[in-house]
Amino acid sequence: MHYIKTWSLLGEMSEKLRRCRKELTAAIDRAFEGVSYSQECTGQQRLELSAAPLSFSLPVHRLLCRRHPLAACSSAAPFAAVPCAPENENPAFATNHAPVNAKPHALCPERKPLTSKENVLMHSSILAPERESWRTAGEGENWRKENLRKDMERDLKADSNMPLNNSSQEVTKDLLDMIDHTSIRTIEELAGKIEFENELNHMCGHCQDSPFKEEAWALLMDKSPQKATDADPGSLKQAFDDHNIVETVLDLEEDYNVMTSFKYQIE
């Protein structure tokens, strides 16, 4: 009786082992079938790629789509052949073999022209020649004077924390008035005018200290003050008025130099 039970247990175990072997064999066969199928698919893809000599990789294909928007760039065939110009042919004159009704792909959309708002905000320099053509000669001169005045006022606002006294404010106001009432358009012209009047004042100072005052005035004014008084009483007054103007400009220059040096020291 004991042997019968043992034999039955061995039979059940052998049956279980047989089923496990069958399942293991089937699993191994399925695994080998999957590997062989993947190898066949890979080989078939390689044959298809080698059969198409004009096929490109995806980045090159996208580049060609950007350069040729009308080329067929369908998502179903991302590696479709794109007509390529020969090496001895100029790419600018290469013919486009794509159909006329072909639509560009979403990866290579055509560039739309800028709107008017974008043109004004991003390319404001395009409108500059038109604005310049609107101005006449007189308007351009007034525009330059206004810009020079605004630049000086902006500099003064930037340096508003500087302790300016009343004389400095008066000097600044005189400079702005001079710009408005003269033909001076730039700081360089103002500096040149001040330098010329400085030399003239230097010469006039030597003339006043010289014992030959009348001869010096005759050389400068092409006539002596005494004769000028006899001939035209207002000419000598005009000469002294001009001299006073030169003195005023020189005082302005000196005050301006003091202000400039003080500004640099603060900075």
UniProtKB/Swiss-Prot annotation:
Pfam annotation, one family: DUF4712
Tissue-specific expression: Testis. Down-regulated in men with spermatocyte arrest.
InterPro entries per the UniProt record, alphabetical: DUF4712 (IPR031670)
UniProt KW keywords: Differentiation, Phosphoprotein, Spermatogenesis
BP GO terms, sorted: cell differentiation; spermatogenesis
Keyword check for Thylakoid: no
Residues found modified as Phosphoserine: S210, S224
Functional description taken from the UniProt entry: Essential for normal spermatogenesis and male fertility.
The protein's name: Uncharacterized protein C3orf62
